[in-house]
Structures are given as structure tokens and as C-alpha cells.
């Protein structure tokens, strides 16, 4: 369905996804402040995921899976030098942590991890916003 969106609909979807990224970063901060670190890291991942989706949609690139979104980011933006490799690593690591937290047992994120990845996620989303302008 998304593949057939007209230009205006794609622009609206891009805006919606970036707004979701901003909202989700805020959710992550609230969760971290209440010491819900697994949930905070989960929300950091989703904030980045929504931002990446916005970037892909803007360029007419669509994927139905989380792994596909990660692959498309790497293929179309990281490997071409449009997005720094470190941003790609941040997104990949958050993907792994989120996946483990959702599907594996005895996975615990902590304050240090949240404190490390929050500014990385914020910088990553800021970079994507620059590319969307």
C-alpha cells in the first residue's frame, strides 16, 4: 500500500513518523526517570525506527519488517556515506537490544546503558531530520 502513495500522502507519512520519533524519545526519558530501563531502551529503538521509516518513505523505499528497515538504511544511506557508520551501529545495537529485551529471558538494561544510548539516539534522529529538510 505505501508503495503507491502519492507525493502529498508520502509527505504526511514522513511528518507523522518524525512526530512519532519525537514522542517516543520523550516516552523513553519518562521511563528512564522511573528506572524502567528495559522499556526506555525499547522506546529509544522505536524512536530511531520511526525516524528511519520517515527517511525511507521520503525516498520511496519501503520495508515490511524491522530487519528490512535496518538493511535498507545500511544499503541506501550508511554504505553510501550519507549517514555516518556510527549512526548505523547505534541503530543496529538498539535493534539487537530491543529484540533481546522482547524475546529473550533475563535481559536487563540499566541506567548506564540508557544514559549511553539516549544521546546517541537523539543525535541519530537529528541527523535524519537534517536529511529530511
Where are these regions (language model features)?
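Terminal alpha-helical segments
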Residues: 1-133
Amino acid at each position: 500500500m505505501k508503495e503507491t502513495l502519492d507525493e502529498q500522502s508520502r509527505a504526511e507519512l514522513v511528518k507523522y513518523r518524525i512526530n512519532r520519533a519525537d514522542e517516543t524519545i520523550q516516552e523513553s526519558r519518562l521511563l528512564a526517570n522511573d528506572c524502567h530501563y528495559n522499556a526506555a531502551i525499547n522506546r529509544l529503538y522505536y524512536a530511531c525506527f520511526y525516524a528511519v521509516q520517515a527517511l525511507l518513505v521520503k525516498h520511496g523505499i519501503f520495508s515490511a519488517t524491522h530487519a528490512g528497515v535496518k538493511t535498507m538504511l545500511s544499503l541506501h544511506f550508511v554504505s553510501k556515506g550519507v549517514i555516518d557508520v556510527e549512526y548505523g551501529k547505534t541503530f543496529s545495537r538498539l535493534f539487537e537490544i530491543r529484540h533481546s529485551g522482547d524475546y529473550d529471558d533475563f535481559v536487563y538494561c540499566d541506567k548506564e546503558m540508557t544514559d549511553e544510548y539516549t544521546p546517541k539516539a537523539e543525535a541519530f534522529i537529528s541527523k535524519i531530520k537534517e536529511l529530511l529538510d
